[in-house]
């Protein structure tokens, strides 16, 4: 009887440990992005054809979750970027940042921000944020917000609908 209790206790402990391990392996994008998961983001320059991806498809890539703070005209802004990195997106299409001489992000309101390859030598982390922590992006930030640690907010582009690579 005593041996049986020990075995049951050991089994319960093993099952609890397995549950804890798998609980820590959940996707970093936990927010409900169903309101914009089917919005298309156009990608040019990663091949001969223009590519259309959705926020939902980007959510399925290897994603990160990072708290990032920057300065804006109104003061300090902190967001919890959740989504893939630019490098992950490029790797998905067989391209390296070394192959890129210029990246342009275009927002739905027409705002455009262009970066040359020299920028990415000092700013290696570029997050394609699909959510702000556990919350979906604000309407003007959807379907994608570019978050670049170590830069001011004018380099963060919200409402991205197009990415161009040269």
Stretches with model-predicted labels:
Residues 12-14, 152:
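Enrichment for repetitive, rod-forming helical segments
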Residues 15-19:
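Alpha-helical transmembrane segments
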Residues 20-24:
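C-terminal motif of bacterial Sec signal peptides marking the signal peptidase cleavage site
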């Amino acid at each position: 009887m005593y041996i049986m209790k020990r075995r049951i206790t050991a089994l319960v402990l093993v099952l609890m440990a397995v549950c804890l391990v798998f609980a820590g392996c959940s996707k970093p994008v936990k927010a409900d992005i169903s309101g914009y998961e089917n919005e298309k983001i156009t990608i040019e320059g990663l091949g001969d054809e223009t590519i259309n991806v959705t926020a939902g498809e980007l959510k399925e890539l290897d994603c990160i979750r990072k708290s990032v703070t920057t300065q804006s005209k109104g003061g300090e802004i902190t967001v919890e970027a959740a989504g893939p990195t630019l490098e992950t997106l490029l790797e998905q299409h067989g391209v390296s940042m070394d192959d890129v001489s210029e990246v342009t992000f275009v927002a739905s309101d027409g705002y455009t921000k262009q970066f040359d390859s020299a920028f990415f030598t000092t700013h290696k982390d570029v997050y394609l944020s699909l959510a702000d922590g556990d919350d979906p992006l604000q309407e003007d930030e959807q379907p994608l917000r570019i978050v670049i640690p170590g830069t001011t907010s004018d380099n963060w582009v919200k409402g991205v609908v197009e990415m161009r690579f040269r």
